[in-house]
Amino acid sequence: ERNLTLAMMSMSCVTASILGAYIEMMPGQYILTAVPINIINALIATSMLNPVSISAEEDTIEKVGATDNGKKEPFFSFLGDSILGAGKLILIIVANVVAFVALAALIDKVLALFWKPLSLESILGVIMFPFSWLLGLPVNQAWDLAQNMGMKLVTNEFVVMGKVTADIAHYPEHLKAVLTVFVTSFANFGTLGMIIGAFKGLANKEDNDYIASNIGYLLLSGILVSLLSAAFVGLFVW
């Protein structure tokens, strides 16, 4: 359950190394505001969706680098093991991301057989419309925001940012704020692949299977945190 909590919180994180790229494409003040708010809302959302109780016996601190006889592992041995482990982990993560993105593309192709405009993005956009409207937007703006939300969930935040970056300066301030805050997270199908891949390389099979069986909670947590953060910031920007 604790591993599932970590996985759920990972859906709402961003790495500091790419904040500069975000700020180049979107209003920087909302990007920087979204990061700490996402952290707080991730704690709230995971506590509601996956409450965990830990006994005093389980609440321990693990020592790293020590062996049973009290001697530490040689540095270069530790370095070699770390490089090997990281290499395997990267390959597992890349393979899982490719598989998840390919699965989303396959679903789009199958849906297009029934009706050309039908896609996973458009379906998620329709599902997200009531929530975007509840953020206090007019219907036409709420619809556009919902479509961007659907696109972000299927692809990633960079696709949406690249789409709107040329015009976002002309958006109403409220729409600009809620859109920027919503897309400032890793909540998408590709991240699901990263998380599953990471836990395959780090956790045992039982823990990994438990996380994989609750993958819906991961996506729900990411969406809920993004909506909570967008709603909170939107309250103060009109």
Give the ranges of each region predicted by the language model.
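Juxtamembrane loop-helix boundary motifs flanking transmembrane segments in multi-pass membrane proteins
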Residues: 67-82, 119, 170, 174, ...
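Long, contiguous bundles of hydrophobic transmembrane helices that form the permeation core
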Residues: 36-87
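Short amphipathic alpha-helical coupling elements at transmembrane boundaries
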Residues: 77-88, 129-133, 209-216
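Transmembrane helix-loop junctions in multipass membrane proteins, especially transporters and channels
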Residues: 25, 50-55, 83, 113, ...
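C-terminal transmembrane helix pair
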Residues: 2-5, 153-238
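Membrane-core helix-loop-helix motifs of multi-pass transport proteins
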Residues: 1-49, 206-228
